[in-house]
Amino acid sequence: MDTAVLEQMLDETFDHAVVHHGYTDYMRDYEVIIYATADPRTGVAPAYLRYLFQYCVEARCETSVPAEIWRVSLDDRLLDHETADPDLGGYVWGVRCHCMYPGAELLPESEATRRWSKALGIDFHEVRIETNAHNLTLLFSDLQVSELPVGYAPSS
């Protein structure tokens, strides 16, 4: 996959929201479902987009929420946005999405990308996706982006 094209695809995720991420039900590819919005004055309708990271040989997910916020965010009443008690002062997990800020970036070639490229005979890339709750690092070969139909739900 051409790195300039890949970088452009990743740049288009800036400041949108991740609503789901995980391996597909067949366990080879990793999908990141994004809710993309624009200023209503543009006339661009919101859309759910599937970023399918193909041949994903490594996926790491780590929290971006600091420990001191975690400490005050353990209460289960923070799991539902509608009923979360603002007086608890913790992170409201129930928002059901994570803001992509600063977003996704293509990382420089690494030992891991070189090793997998050599082993499989295809190019590999590494991307870092930063949100306000989780940071993802994915090692993959190709990226496909598609708009999702209304009612799409990831397989479980």
Task: Indicate residue ranges for each PLM-predicted region.
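Surface-exposed, interaction-prone regions used to assemble/regulate multi-protein complexes
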Residues: 1-156
